[in-house]
Structure formats: structure tokens, C-alpha cells
């Protein structure tokens, strides 16, 4: 009998705990009264507002969420969303007022306080109030030291101010929070160290610059500008062999960006009295990447400088099918044709390959925000992300290219 009573008491305690937990999940005590958390979400305005928000219809979302908030003025999450929407519409002052009013609530939890401060920091950053935004993000980190969003925004603000050491310090904190789960951390750390090296380089401190560039490469072997800059520092220090070693490592580590080192290597090989090394380099790259147009273009320019214009023209026609829309190739072809006296046969070969080509001046595009640029940029000026530019190419099929080359040869 005693055992049965004991089991009954345990069961009753479990049921009571479950009921209390459900009640705590649904209701919240605020200002001496219980608030039904579900009531807010059951209003049609709340759901409509979220749907409009998903569809990026900001004005309609604001209207519906304002209606939803009117049924319960204490709804923290809706007030936060409304403030953020005001910011997205450019109404920064209104967003700041909403979020500052939320901070006046005496019953905010630490987590709620941190996220309202985060929203306020975003308001200030959007409005260009740099100092106040920095202060807000730093206050978030006092409450929540592992808040990744605050850390990222703090890093970006330091980058905007070119405070690279501070940006690096904050990104290292982000990397600790991520604990190796995000490979872009190492990439960004590498680029930030490269920027620190560039600051030393401009200040004339070659030794410190070289250390920073080497550290950037150690952190992420694909930090392409660090190889270029390290080679430049070594060249200024009189270490031409070391400079060549750095530039050649770039081609091995990041072959798609190796063309940045072509002019440097061509000059360095010539200074060593071994221009044939550049020809060999280009031929190896062409062999390793049959569709690579940049090594072909570089080799043609090298041959033109040596007076071998017809051989240079042949390499240009080889490059063209792999990148028919690249303006640089066409400009080089016309310069070479000019030197060769505009021979009709050469012009016919060129016309056959370019019949459907479209030229453009900004072939590089950011993968994140689609910003276009005439040159490859290491950091996007619009979304401020690192190493997001790729070359937009509209190459034709190998079969068509091969057929056209065959026709050209018969012509």
C-alpha cells in the first residue's frame, strides 16, 4: 500500500510539473499580470505580417505587424521587428526610437537586452553614427561575449575605418566562437593580416610587412595578394630570387589568380638574364589548363615584345575561343594586326572566331551581391565581403571552338 501511494505521489508530481511547464511556456508575468504568449501569434495580423516580410513587402509587413502589436503593446519581438523594418526603409530615427524605448523596460532578460542593443547598433551603423554603433556592439558583447552578429558587425566597422589590427582581433574572436566550423574564418584572417602588412609597407617598414604577409599565407595559403606583396617587399630589399619564389608560389597555390604575377615574373626573369623561363612558365600553365586564356595572352605579349608578332598572333587566336568576350584579347589582336600590316588572311581568321562575340568592360562580378567591376577586387566595395569576385565568362563549347580553329587553319 505504501509503495502504491509513493508511486501515485511521484506520478502526481510529474503531472503537476508538466502543467506548470506548459503554463510557463504559454504565459509570462509582466507588470503583475499574466500575458498569453500564444494570443499574439494567433492574430491574423501577425501571420500576415510575417508572410509579407518573407515576400520582402516591407510596407505591408509594417502595417500588419503594427496592427498585431496594438493587441499587445508588450510584445517585445514584434516591436524589435518593426524597428528593424523602419531601419530597412531608411527611417533610422524612428528605428532608434523604437529600440531605445524597448531598452527602458525593466524586465528584459539579459538575452533580450543584448539583442535589442544589437538592433540599436545596426540602426546607428545604418545611419552613419559610427561611435554610437561601436559603443552599442561593445555593450552587446559585455552581456553576451559570444554574440557572433555583434562581433561580425564590429569587425566590419573596424574594416570600414581601416583599423585592421582591431578588425583582426575581433575576427579571431569570431573564429573561436565558430570553432573551425566555418572555413571562411581563415580566409578573412589571411586577408586582414595582408592589410596589416600593406600598412607596414606604406610606412616603409619592410621587415614588419614581410612578417605580416608571411603570416597571412600561413593562416590561409590562398591569400593571393599576400604572395604578390611579399614578393614586392623582397624585391625592394634586393632579394630578387626570394621575390620570384613568392610569386611562383602564388601560381602554385592559387592558379586562378596566378596571372597577377605574370608581369612581375617576366620582368624578374629578364633581370636575371633568363627570359626563356617566362616562356616555359606560360607553356606549363597552358598544358595544365587547356582552357586558360590568360597564359596564352601573356605569352603572346611576351613574344610581341621580342618581335615575334606572327607567333604572338597565333597564341591570341588560341586564347580567343576560351574567352571570346574579353576585350583585352581583341585589343591585343588589333595591335598585332596593325604591326603585321592588316594582312587579309589574318583578318579573316580573326573574324571567323569573333562573329558572335560580345565585348564588355566589367567581367568581374561579386558572388554575394552581384556588384560588377572591371578588375578583380579582393574586397567588394558594396557588400564588403572578402574574396568574392569571380570572372564572369560566356565561353562557347569546346566542339564549336575546335571547329572554328580548324576552319581558320584551312583558311
Where do the model's predicted regions map?
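Flexible helix-coil transition and linker loops at the boundaries of alpha-helical arrays
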Residues: 33-36, 103-112, 176-187
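Alpha-helical segment of the N-proximal tetratricopeptide repeat
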Residues: 38-74, 81, 87-91, 97, ...
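Start-of-helix register in tetratricopeptide repeats
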Residues: 43, 77, 111-115, 149, ...
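Residue at a conserved register position within TPR or TPR-like alpha-solenoid repeats
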Residues: 52, 86, 124, 158, ...
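Short coil turns that delineate tetratricopeptide repeat
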Residues: 73, 107, 111, 145, ...
